């Protein structure tokens, strides 16, 4: 069964808009600041996730669609948090190093256990030469609790959503994100006992969450890059890309364009 839902068309339409309007400007930037670089990497991760969702055209992929939609939502929250969390870029970079250190320490610990495999020189050197500096910086950023930090902001996802203080995002987190998590985590929840007719709805819910999150990302990137200052109709074209799949025929499309001032 092919997904013919309007949300799949929306996602494709928004990606086309992105490729024409936002992506070229992003890729044309030079000498990025640390926060700009973090924003760019996060934005590119969103793009690749969207590309994957667009390729998954069958309802049988409802679990993968849900997992990817969940990731896009989390990345969209990250982009918003970068605007408000102090030392965001430093925290993101340090957390990346901290995660690497955690993996290295686990490998070294395992290598010292019975039947453990020896670690490479790269791993042992990382543990020997970078551990002190990484943990010292982590202590500065998160205090003594740094070992329990699971996200660069220091907040769990629910807390991150609360930090943003956006009613729409809070609503989506409570009513949509959780159901996507059911398709991600082990257990019976999410699909057990459901009729076959439920799975297209699950796939469409995932696409809907992805559309909401991707639209938020594009709006943020337009604002951050200041594109609206040079092109007063860019938000109108974004709204067109979002709503065009709702139209039925050329007459409705022309009416929509007219209502948006295009």
Model-derived features: positions:
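Long, hydrophobic/aromatic-enriched structural stretches that serve as scaffold segments
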Residues: 17-82
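Short alpha-helical segments used as structural interaction elements across diverse proteins
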Residues: 42, 67, 88-90, 99, ...
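Short, glycine/acidic-rich hinge or "gate" loops at secondary-structure transitions
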Residues: 65-67, 84-93, 227-236
